[in-house]
From Swiss-Prot:
Cystine crosslinks: none
Pfam families reported for this sequence: Ribosomal_L10
Entry keywords, A to Z: Ribonucleoprotein, Ribosomal protein, RNA-binding, rRNA-binding
UniProt organism field: Mycoplasma mycoides subsp. mycoides SC (strain CCUG 32753 / NCTC 10114 / PG1)
Annotated gene: rplJ
GO biological process, one term: translation
Subunit record text: Part of the ribosomal stalk of the 50S ribosomal subunit. The N-terminus interacts with L11 and the large rRNA to form the base of the stalk. The C-terminus forms an elongated spine to which L12 dimers bind in a sequential fashion forming a multimeric L10(L12)X complex.
Similarity field: Belongs to the universal ribosomal protein uL10 family.
GO cellular component terms attached to this protein's record: ribonucleoprotein complex; ribosome
Matching InterPro entries: Ribosomal_uL10, Ribosomal_uL10-like_sf, Ribosomal_uL10_bac, Ribosomal_uL10_bac_type
HAMAP family: Ribosomal_uL10
Protein name: Large ribosomal subunit protein uL10
Keyword Cell division found: no
SUPFAM superfamilies, per the entry: Ribosomal protein L10-like
Amino acid sequence: MSNSRPAHARKAEIVVEIVSKIKSAQGVAIAEYKHLTVAKMTELRVQALKQNIDIKVYKDSLVRRAAEELGLVDLIPFLTQQNVFIFSNEDSISAAKLVANFAKKNEALKLKAGIYEGKVVDTVGINEVASLPSKEELYSMFASSLLYPLRKAMAAINAVAETRN
């Protein structure tokens, strides 16, 4: 008698894993990677690892089962071809941003859809998510907006001081 479990039990475990990853991820991106070389996929994985982003390749049928279980049936039409699933653990946009930036240099990778704030977004929506500023960019913009009035006041004070001299 063999030690291997039935295939359907292994598949059920993978579906549970996918459900768990989707639930715990801040954001999910789905990209088609047809014709992407192993070297390029490795490069993408290395970039993802640096940003605490998980990249997984699952059978679309298993992701379909997980999507149905989570009530994300709008995701099902995007589960065709060879897909890679990118799970962002830090914030909701970094998965989409990673794929969009990588796809600019690698036409074999195409951003297809994603899950943003618990909702399925199509290709247009996930590209919009990818174009949003990151947390660091937002902090920088906020700090600049706080400093602007102070800089303006300092310039006025310097102008007055120079006219008195």
